Amino acid sequence: MAQHENLSVVLYEKNDLRLEYRPIPEPESNEVLLKMHSVGICGSDVHYWQNGRIGDNVVRKPMVLGHEGSGTVFKVGPGVHHLKPGDRVAIEPGIPREYDEHCRAGRYNLSPTIFFCATPPDNGHLCQYHTHNANYCYKLPESLSFEEGALIEPLSVAIHACRRGGITIGSKVLILGAGTIGIMNLLVSKAMGASQVLICDLLESRLKKAKQMGATFTIAVEKNMSSKELSQKIRDAFGGAMADTSIECTGAELCIQAGIYATKSGGVLVLVGMDKPSANIPVLEVGIREIDIRGVFRYCNTWPVAIDMLASKAIDVKPVVTHRFLLEEAVKAFETTKKGVGIKVMLKCDSSNENH
């Protein structure tokens, strides 16, 4: 195999996104070499491209983007025995580097030294060939497509968020933001027994998609609307009731505030979206009504559950993909994502395999 056949999407610095050939890596003992098939573009990929950083994570050297992927095992390291060439797998992008207190507690996503694809300085898998720890590659049932395998990553965010939110049978759930993560939270909320799910967004096209995918109510957020006005619309839609659990997926201050005002006393607000480092919130409202605010950082222990949910047809994530591009069209795909067109943009890394 020629050593220049690994086409990769590489971010050099802010606004400097390139397609380039890199050497095909060799798997270490506990790794597999994957021939990538489908990789979704995440908002964080675009944020790194546009800003060169997310918080303290700064792009200081060229980095391969992408952390929502699936592919086929091409080669296995000598220490790998549960996977073989030809196996179709979904990739969990976060791999603990050490067995610290967070790992011992089963919350390895909180480990400060975790390897995470496409978080500086760690390379992602928006490329044709990628090596990955075999224990974080999960076999896909024949009934699931590569695209569904790639969508397990954003689905995992929603599973973790809904777990953190304590959603159960009969819950009234508010979701702020109808992008990929908002839609995934809609699907998981309903699968976990929510009786009513209300979703808000600025874009009518996204709300239409949310309605098609099972939202009970949708609300179009107006640009000049106050957080109290939005929360009142939410209460009106719920027939005067308030949400048991609110899941904020935008990071926008207005939506965080509205989530607090629209959540019942003793309820839970889950913060999934990330935008600015800080936000003004009505702390008195939180305190006197005992609203629990819970953060979400990625996920942990979700891939097997997600695969079971998809294989059992408990949820259908396929309609989330609205745009597809070849790997060679990566820049166009990133521009499409940046414009907020559609929901999920998917890149196809293996043009010889048309199986979605």
Give the residues covered by each predicted segment.
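NAD(P)H dinucleotide-binding glycine-rich loop of Rossmann-like/cofactor-binding domains
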Residues: 97-176
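Adenosine-nucleotide cofactor-binding segment
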Residues: 175-178, 190-256
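Glycine-centered, small-residue-biased loops immediately flanking beta-strands
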Residues: 267
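N-terminal Rossmann-fold NAD(P) dinucleotide-binding loop
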Residues: 182-183
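C-terminal hydrophobic helical "lid"/dimerization subdomain
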Residues: 1-4, 8, 257-261, 300, ...
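Rossmann-fold NAD(P)-binding glycine/threonine-rich loop
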Residues: 273-289
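Glycine-rich beta-strand-centered segment in the early N-terminal region that forms part
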Residues: 25-39, 54-101, 141-143
